[in-house]
Amino acid sequence: MTRLYKTTNGIDYIEHLNHIRPPGDKSNEHAMFFGIDATAHMLLRRDNPSSPTRSQALLGTALPPYQDWEWRRLNVRIGGPSIIQIAPNKVIACIRRYGNGNWTELGWIDIKKASYEPAIRLPSGGDTSYAGLVWRDMKLWISYYSSHEGKTSIYLSKAIIE
């Protein structure tokens, strides 16, 4: 279950919304960001082995006060999502992909079209996921773990985004 909390002092929190995810959906991991216009965006992993389309990620959007969410299906199955907005209309996701093995990948999210476009496959494989993203000085720093070199290790990558 995903909940939103609010605070006025950074110490005491109260529940704002009890259940964001679509009712009855087999969703679990998520990542979110707030756009410069205060719109909330959430990238949501779903698992439903009986239906390929019901395993595709969802992109959720809500305006303040974040009570009503619109959910649209993305064209990709994901794991361990991380998402960051680096400029207006420039949203990058780092996800675990499934296919012929697992790998960690950077890609572009088009918020308006609710679509995902792969950009680069990071050195990864096996047990890999859960990236952290930092945008600083026009560079994207990515930390993630992977077991593609045998023992599971943590990796740090830097990407120049044009």
Task: Name each model feature, range by range.
Residues M1-G80, I84-G126, W135-E162:
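Beta-rich carbohydrate-recognition and catalytic domains
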